Regions:
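Membrane-helix interface and helix-disruption motif detector
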Residues: 1-5, 25-33, 54-67, 132-152, ...
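Alpha-helical transmembrane-segment detector that highlights a single hydrophobic TM helix
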Residues: 52-81, 201-218
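Final/C-terminal transmembrane alpha-helix of multipass membrane proteins
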Residues: 113-130, 247-271
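A cytosolic-side transmembrane-helix exit/cap motif
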Residues: 83-97, 171-175, 221-236
Length: 278
């Protein structure tokens, strides 16, 4: 049963990613089912893997919630690495290049992109190992830091996202102070939320950035649906019919958010044991 719940939760995280991605891109790029299900398939893979690695008891709503957030992070990281360093695509359709760029100009050498991508992934892995060891030290009793200080470390993904976003966007759009600090601030908030449901520092770190992406993308995509995303600024809408067709996916998206909120409520009601307890 745990495996089945992990599959469903992973699928939900993947479809959530797929839907906001489709909603913002389809008027400019059109729609294909293989592209839409790409994130869903990643979620189906990562959901069970995260469950197995952390040995989560999915009979508890709190663990389903953190599984969703952690899976979300894994899916996003995989897709961003793929799009930035691996995928070959014409960048002229974008106002802001989506693949690795320097001062707003795409890096033409595929080999150079792969090398930079390797070191990027290496840094992420090293950060993950450091957080994993921090978690071991905490549970062994050798780390007696204030929980709110630990949450600063758990929000490290927000800083990685902020610097990566500034590197990509600032040469084209200019540097925005609020935009730069938004991800770290929201990441700290969700690290706090995740810490109410689990005392695993690594899971808190993963949920921190996972839920940050989920909420920020929901805000940008669905609260301002007529405003083109930065990467398509000034670009023509080539598939205007999808401004209407995409709305058919809204019930699924809303249902997934309801699922997440219900798991959070049940987790609180059932008395989840977290890093932070009131």
């Amino acid at each position: 049963m745990n495996f089945l719940i992990a599959l469903i939760t992973g699928l939900a995280a993947g479809l959530h990613n797929s839907t906001w991605g489709m909603y913002k891109d389809s008027p400019h790029e059109g729609f294909t089912w293989p592209k839409y299900f790409r994130s869903a398939i990643a979620g189906l893979i990562y959901g069970p893997l995260v469950w197995y690695f952390f040995d989560l008891d999915l009979s508890k709503a709190a663990n389903i919630l953190v599984l969703f957030g952690a899976t979300y992070l894994c899916e996003r990281l995989t897709m961003e690495v793929y799009k930035t360093f691996i995928r070959r695509e014409d960048q002229s359709k974008y106002f802001i290049p989506m693949q690795l760029s320097v001062f707003g100009k795409p890096v033409k050498s595929y080999g150079a992109r792969l090398v930079v991508g390797f070191f990027y992934v290496l840094i992420v892995v090293l950060v993950g190992i450091a957080v994993y060891n921090l978690n071991k030290a905490y549970h062994a009793g050798s780390l007696n830091w204030n929980p709110y200080l630990i949450l600063l470390i758990c929000s490290v993904g927000g800083w990685i996202s902020a610097f990566g976003g500034a590197w990509k966007d600032a040469p084209v759009e200019g540097f925005e102070t609020f935009k730069f600090f938004r991800s770290p601030g929201v990441a700290y908030f969700f690290a706090f939320i995740a810490a109410l449901f689990t005392n695993n520092i690594m899971l808190i770190t993963m949920c921190s950035i996972g839920f940050t992406v989920a909420t920020i993308e929901t805000y940008k995509t669905f609260f301002f649906p007529s405003r083109p995303r930065g990467k398509f600024a000034g670009k023509p809408i080539l598939f205007p019919e999808w401004e209407t067709k995409r709305q058919k996916f809204l019930p699924l998206y809303i249902a997934i958010w309801i699922f997440v909120i219900v798991m959070a409520i049940l987790g609180i009601v059932n008395g989840a044991e977290g890093l932070i307890n009131f």
